[in-house]
Amino acid sequence: MAAPTSLKQIDLSPLPGKSYFNCEREWREDFIYFLMTDRFQDSAARVPVTGAARSVGVATGNSFYGGTIRGVTNNLAYIAGLGCTAIWLSPVLEANSYHGYDINNYLDIDPNFGTKQDLVDLVAAAHGFVKDGEPWPIRIIMDVVINHSGDNWGYPGGFPYYYSGGQRFPFGTWHRTDRPLPVELRNPDYYHRCGEMSNYDTSPENQLGDMDSLKDYENDDDEIGSEVINALIMAFCYWIREADVDGFRMDAVKHMGPVACSRFCSNVREYAYALGKRGFFLFGEVASPTDDLYNSYLGPNTSVQVGDETVFFGLNSVLDFRLAEGVYGDANNAPLPTILKGQNGPQGLFNRLNLQLNRALNRGELGRYLVTFVDNHDSFWQPTGRYANGATDAQVIGAIGFILCSLGTPCIYYGTEQGFSGSGGDIQMREAMFDTTNTTSLLNTGCTIYQEIAKIAAVMRAQEPLRFGRMYYREISGDAVNFGMPFGSEYTLALSRMLYSVEVLVAYNVSGAARTDSVIVDATLYAPGSTMTYLYGGTGTVTVQTAASGACFVTLPLAGYQFVVLG
């Protein structure tokens, strides 16, 4: 059956006889695997490389390389084996480029990636996946783009126009007579037509301008804006109906009109509920150095004022760029990757948690559902490339261990588990996990990094405090007498996750040299002489001791970059 070309051809009633998937697991329990569809795996039968060593990703260039949806389906065991319970697919709808963020057809799958049936099959296989004889349902998240379209039309003369004080330029010509789809989007008034923006953090330019050649939708609070967002709502609800996907990662949310974002989230959430999908997850890309901006986007009950209107953005979560990217030039708010590599002190982590705890007095969402990561597919915030670039295996393991065991919903970028270390730009950090010139793949389950991440993920899955608990950074001491929060570049970074009467202690030596530090634990939970058991990274137990001050502590001898979990 041919794909629809108009919204008038879309039926959003439930598929006859279809029982839609509703996972009871909370999203903060999940471990998300983010993959670039074109770069993960193709549909060929391949033999994974073996051995404990890390791999170098395959260079691919800036065009379609061959990855497919079927390649994901065929390798669900690899993703589940890592401990992941959700997959975030880069955009799979028909687009002008391999990355998919420049959509030209919202109603069909890009033929480079496969077919609608391939997506349906992937979701069904993921929902029904069995690991070690037990159900292991994997959620599938679609990456959706509603702020802008692809480069589907041009300005007069065929050359770039640039933002100039909000001036609206004339429409030029469509690049194709049969795109974009649905046909309703072939309305020049549906686009702001203000030219390419230069300032991505300055309003109103960052909500009116095009992102390079990608054309910005008119998503204002007016009649045209309502028509545009309603069209996009229908288009993406179509994919919930047809494929039973479990969530949307919303691209470039910061550049959308707030009313449009609110309407999209509210309508999509209601539609998912109507199908029985109670836990549909909506998280957005808000590249921002401030938690206050994040705060305004989170939760269907969180509102902001837009003029005389009260607007509820309605996102469940945002990607935690504030943690990963930090604040440029501010050592007290350093990027997480530089902290975990010992290049900056940890004060930024402590400051941020204190701010989050203060905000939680009024609302509890921030930090609960933030999607945390140490690297991804965009180079604009990663001047040194992927996290593994210049990092040892142990440092990569420690970094992913940190996001697995700290607040938030952890997300790993494909290839990190194999030590991919691309740097220099987007293309270099979007390596392939297969080589079209041979029959092997880089899905190596014997790689040390892969295996150790899987072990930590298993601990996270088994220990409820690591999924639901409160979090506190812990004071340390080199002499078991004088305790304080660590500083500098050589220290043990320690945190506790607390859930009712259970504490799980996480510690990571951020330096390459062995060190022994004593770490505070909760004195109300441990009697002197009691023990904590290694859950990961060590064997046996450590004894709880009491300082002269009455504080309880354990002493941890750690090798360089050693990561441990105790409970």
Feature locations, PLM:
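Short coil-to-helix leader/linker segments, especially the first N-terminal amphipathic alpha-helix
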Residues: 1-19
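Active-site-proximal helices and loops of the catalytic beta/alpha 8
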Residues: 2, 7, 127, 148, ...
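Substrate-binding/active-site clefts of carbohydrate-active enzymes
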Residues: 18, 24-30, 38-85, 91-243, ...
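C-terminal beta-strand-rich structural cap/linker in extracellular carbohydrate-active enzymes
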Residues: 31, 545-567
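A secondary-structure boundary/capping signal
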Residues: 36, 89, 252, 414-416
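Short, flexible loop/turn elements at secondary-structure junctions
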Residues: 36-39, 93, 110-113, 146, ...
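Short acidic/polar active-site loop segments enriched in Thr and Asp
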Residues: 85-87, 246, 410
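Solvent-exposed beta-strand/loop surfaces of large extracellular or lumenal domains
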Residues: 533-551
